[in-house]
Swiss-Prot record:
It comes from Human coronavirus HKU1 (isolate N1) (HCoV-HKU1). This is Membrane protein. Component of the viral envelope that plays a central role in virus morphogenesis and assembly via its interactions with other viral proteins. Homomultimer. Interacts with envelope E protein in the budding compartment of the host cell, which is located between endoplasmic reticulum and the Golgi complex. Forms a complex with HE and S proteins. Interacts with nucleocapsid N protein. This interaction probably participates in RNA packaging into the virus. GO terms for molecular function: structural constituent of virion. Residues 1-20, 73-80 are virion surface.
Length: 223
């Protein structure tokens, strides 16, 4: 490959570049760090969505850089490593889409393409299905109602609900299985507040039950 087409930088030019762009790079890295550190669904859904976009862009950016390194490798050793890294990045990116599509088939929610987790908590509240990502594989889930505001695992889902509106079952959908949680405890603190604890009771390869009466017969279809 003709090296004359490649830009050549001296150490002085590199230092000058860092001096000119140091502030901008620092601000960008600080912004990304804050988003990644504090982007949780229990804090701010808007910040969490920005975090998901940043994480989602990481893989295509990585693939682009590894392909670039293949074309402009310094020597054969760097070329070999670049090819391996490119293959690994593309394979992982494809697996991400395969798993996300499988989870989307199971839940029908766009949260299935969340790059952070493959666990989606699903709860049917008065005929409305709420789907939210959860990071860990919990053995118990806690639903809290505070003056009509509904929270599941600290994530606010909506308002205008009471403890009597809580379902008997809550599910967590994964790529391979659907975990069912059964309500095991309910405590009413006052008229509009209380909490319930759901315990994992069953795991199977099912689709998410439909919230529509006409779709209840498809609740146990294989995904």
């Amino acid at each position: 490959m003709n090296k004359s087409f490649l830009p050549q930088f001296t150490s002085d030019q590199a230092v000058t570049f860092l001096k000119e762009w140091n502030f901008s790079l620092g601000v960008i890295l600080l912004f990304i760090t804050i988003i990644l550190q504090f982007g949780y669904t229990s804090r701010s859904m808007f910040v969490y969505l920005i975090k998901m976009i940043i994480l989602w862009l990481m893989w295509p950016l990585t693939i682009t850089l590894t392909i670039f390194n293949c074309f402009y490798a310094l020597n054969n050793a760097f070329l070999a490593f670049s090819i391996v890294f490119t293959i690994i990045s593309i394979v992982i990116w494809i697996l991400y889409f395969v798993n996300s599509i499988r989870l989307f088939i199971r839940t029908g929610s766009w949260w299935s393409f969340n790059p952070e987790t493959n666990n989606l908590m699903c709860i049917d509240m008065k005929g409305k299905m709420f789907v939210r990502p959860v990071i860990e594989d919990y053995h118990t889930l806690t639903a809290t109602v505070i003056r009509g505001h509904l929270y599941i695992q600290g994530v606010k889902l909506g308002t205008g609900y009471t403890l009597s509106d809580l379902p008997v079952y809550v599910t967590v959908a994964k790529v391979q299985v659907l975990c069912t949680y059964k309500r095991a405890f309910l405590d009413k603190l006052d008229v509009n507040s209380g909490f319930a604890v759901f315990v994992k009771s069953k795991v199977g390869n099912y689709r998410l039950p439909s919230s529509k009466p006409s779709g209840m017969d498809t609740a146990l279809l294989r995904a």
